[in-house]
Swiss-Prot record:
Protein encoded by which gene: msrA
Record protein name field: Peptide methionine sulfoxide reductase MsrA
EC number: 1.8.4.11
PANTHER family in the record: PEPTIDE METHIONINE SULFOXIDE REDUCTASE, PEPTIDE METHIONINE SULFOXIDE REDUCTASE MSRA 2
Lineage, highest ranks first: Bacteria, Bacillati, Bacillota, Bacilli, Lactobacillales
Gene Ontology molecular function, alphabetical: L-methionine:thioredoxin-disulfide S-oxidoreductase activity; peptide-methionine (S)-S-oxide reductase activity
Length: 169
């Protein structure tokens, strides 16, 4: 098994697209990239921990490639917005591909370059590509939020879904 970590705004919205794929062992919502150990949601939302909301994906590379995961990642985000995603603003919601090793870094960078060259967006692709750091799972009530709180999930993800439909589908 291998690990991928992606940040794309609110972690609630980043779980379902990956969780439904063959070859995915698990998708956890959590926090990474900050300077506080074991942060809470409240602490991360206070924007004092340096953490970004992200998802940790454990996958079987014999069934799905990291490159495929990166391509799906792009289609869940606005890669031209470095200051958050959709209705969620601030560094704790910034888009980041966190890489585990040099191979993942190269795959992510090549994919980013290809997206920029495609002309799909008229603004620069600003999603950051950074080395993975300690990943702290979020509190239980955040896990699989789209299943446990479907009405609130639908409300919180409406702008995201409209953007994705217009720009990726």
């Amino acid at each position: 098994m291998e690990r991928a970590i992606f940040a794309g705004g609110c972690f609630w919205c980043m779980v379902q697209p990956f969780e439904e794929l063959d070859g995915i062992e698990s998708v956890l919502s959590g926090y990474t990239g900050g300077h506080v150990e074991n942060p809470t949601y409240k602490e991360v939302c206070s924007k004092t921990t340096g953490h970004t909301e992200a998802v940790e994906i454990i996958f079987n590379p014999e069934k799905i490639s990291y490159a495929n995961l990166v391509e799906l990642y792009w289609a869940q985000t606005d890669p031209t917005d470095a200051f958050g995603q959709f209705e969620d603003r601030g560094d704790n919601y910034r888009p980041v591909i966190f890489y585990e090793n040099e191979e993942q870094r190269q795959i992510a960078q090549k994919s980013k370059d290809k997206l920029q060259a495609s002309g799909r967006f008229d603004r620069p692709i600003v999603t950051s590509i950074e080395p993975a750091d300690t990943f702290y799972p979020a509190e239980d009530y955040h896990q699989a939020f789209y299943r446990t709180n479907p009405a609130r999930y639908a409300l919180s993800s409406a702008r995201r879904h409209a953007f994705l439909e217009e720009n990726w589908h």
